[in-house]
Amino acid sequence: MKFIHMADMHFDAPFTVLNTRSKLGEKRRLEQREAFKRIIEYIENNNIEYLFIAGDLYEDAYIRETTIEYINSLFKKIPNTKIYITPGNHDPYTINSMYSTFKWSTNVKIFKNNVETVENDAVDIYGYGFNDYYCKSSEIENIKIKNKDKINILITHGTLDGGSAPNLEYNPLNTAKLKQLGFDYIALGHIHKADYNTEENQRIVYPGSTISMGFDELGKHGVILGEIDKEKVKLEFLPIDKKEFVERKIDVTNIASVEELIEKINEEQIEKDMFYKIILVGKRNFEINTYYLYRFITEENIIKIKDETQINININELSKEINLKGLFLKEILDDKNNENIDENTAEKIIEIGLNVLK
């Protein structure tokens, strides 16, 4: 059997990181639609039997009915494909949610917050969805497979081996326990970075977010194309998002003024299919105000500027001066040398202190 496994599309997300530049958030929401349409067209053109959507298809707080109508219209274009959706923490199945109130295409099955099984001729699909924005436990690790001769698929949204306290609120799952259940494939959502291995017959998979949501999601994004039988799983990553979020560093050490820095940023080779974060590094010889820089950046695809520079001064020499500035620097250097504070903390304190003592 062949399937597409996707998750974390987050339809109608506000894309706040893009709203600093004119209408880019709005454009990104249109790109969501285009990306989803490409998935459906691929399914249609390649006779894919199953579509697994492992949660966070949309943003419950922002979703518009017109967007749901658009999604559903595409579902209707692939009537021979069985579509299974397990709601996540951003799109839980509640009494007033679109999952509950909207009339979905007949080839769509939406799971609720109890483990359900859909039996097909050769494949049984098990699913579990959120009914709230949090899910601290579920029945998943107690599932008993009904027919082990068939291909058995589990779809859910959750945190695999989460560990930290915040992740324990989003359906915490344990890899070892999941493997013991005996599923041929486990389609997960929630983690926005893809986690799959085509070489090791991996059966517990995150496809990552379908399109990148921001600078914490660098690289290519898309869906998993899978082909499975009882002996093996064949997986392929299909890039869907035509845009990427990219970080680029600029060393300011040899730049003499803010005007020269603006010129340097505007000379960067910017690709139209990328969103850029410029990270300023090195030793600076002038004050940097990122809000001021934004006003003069000509490329709208430069979304964010982060200042990680350090002030270019000879701290040891200045600490010898017989004045308040010298006494301040000597105190900080003594603390650093005695390992009372680390180097990064010392640099931050020095920078703040020197600004105060100007």
Where are these regions (language model features)?
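N-terminal active-site segment of His-dependent metallophosphoesterases
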Residues: 1-69, 340, 344, 348-358
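His/Asp/Glu-rich metal-coordinating catalytic cores
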Residues: 22, 50, 59-205, 209-214
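Glycine-rich phosphate-binding loop signature in dinucleotide/nucleotide-binding domains
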Residues: 45-47, 147-149, 269-272
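A conserved active-site cap/scaffold subdomain adjacent to cofactor or substrate pockets
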Residues: 189, 194-258
